[in-house]
Amino acid sequence: MSDYREIVYTEQGHVGVITIDRPDARNALTFTTYAELTDVVATSTARCLVVTGRDPAFCSGDDVKQIMTNAGSQVSSNLRAEPRLTPAAKALLETDVPVIAAVNGAAVGWGMELALMADIRVCSERAKFGELFVKRGLCCDVAGLARLTQLVGRESAAELLYTGRIIDASTAKQLRLVSRVVTHDELMPTTLALAHEIAGNPPLAVRRIKAGLRTALDPDFDELGRWVTTSLAELFQTADHREGVAAFLDKRAPHYVGR
């Protein structure tokens, strides 16, 4: 089992548990976190995976200081040179085993994308969800466009994406974004019980069912990923993106100019 710096991976029988482990940064994602998520999903031999975050957050999205400031121009260049579904998204969307998100706190930005890439979402009463990309002058990733719409319908998805609004666990349940809401103390026991129930079934049949759901419901994520990365490459270069990031870091209201 690999040693990781920003995630923790453990196995309980046939269930693998991935915990994002940057609590001081509210489990914000760095380039290292993305690489480790990609590796652990690709190399795990578990029959069911659980993804969660170390309290107090599930995942607060990209680490703005690393990914959206000084590194922003490099990210844009990389996306422009090779528009494709990002490796972490590809690993999560294409794994042949079920993935359950145990959402223990805020799941915003790519943290919400991560939750949406799971097959099932169980959340604590402390959970919050938000597709905040529009607030940074960006578009969301593939799960926000496809999976969110599958779960809550086009109209509710459009409202969440266009506004960047944050919703609580109760609202998420009403919208059918999550399968259930439990107390914070019950989150991991409930999620692990479900994961072990799934992992106890014949693995080949479970994998075939997952493949069938993907075939029946999902778009071509590779094609959608190319569209997303091409769009992000352009949006990373806009004044509105720079203003969205600066306003967030300065804790002030943004002023967008449409360019």
What are these regions (language model features)?
Residues T32, E36, R84, A91, ...:
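Charged catalytic carboxylate motif
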Residues M1-R54:
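Conserved CoA-thioester-binding segment of acyl-CoA-metabolizing enzymes
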Residues G53-A91, A107, G137, D220:
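Glycine- (often His-adjacent) and acidic-residue-rich active-site loop
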Residues E82-A89, A195, L213, G225-L232, ...:
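Hydrophobic alpha-helical core bundles mediating ligand binding, dimerization, or RNAP-core interactions
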